[in-house]
Amino acid sequence: MPDKGLFDIHCHIVPSVDDGASSAEEAYKMLQMEYRQGVRNIIATPHYRLQMFETPLETVEHQFLILKQLAQKVAPDLHIYLGCEFHSNMEMVEMLRNGEVHTMAGSRYVLTEFSGSTKASYIRERLYSLLSHGFKPIVAHIERYECLRKDIGFVEELADL
């Protein structure tokens, strides 16, 4: 990955696959805004959540190719990578191992999120499961989880993983 410019590693910009960019036109405008703000590298992270955001992988990948073409129209030094914001579930590791969802730019990093009321024990178990299978979790929206807002010690534990 190039090391020039800012990185946006959590962006719902792939058109027509989740609650982010609703069209290629909107995605193009978002790319222009990102570029004007100094962003040169974007990891597009469409949602994956059972029974809510289950866009077929082929559709996500097709729309991502459209996004890459749009990025080149904005500027040749705007680099786009595919990732995923994965709402944690018990099948997560298996889905990642089977390539049913994307890691962050093909790395071992996984952007994962939880419901706001998720218990600390479940968050801990899911993160340790990822780690024990060679994945490196990035917890999205840390401010949303009640158990983390109430327990700074748990936040520190997660930071030390």
Name what the model sees in each region.
Residues E54-L161:
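Extended substrate/RNA-proximal surfaces in nucleic-acid metabolism proteins
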Residues M1-D77, E156:
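An N-terminally biased module of ancient metal coordination in phosphate/nucleic-acid-related enzymes
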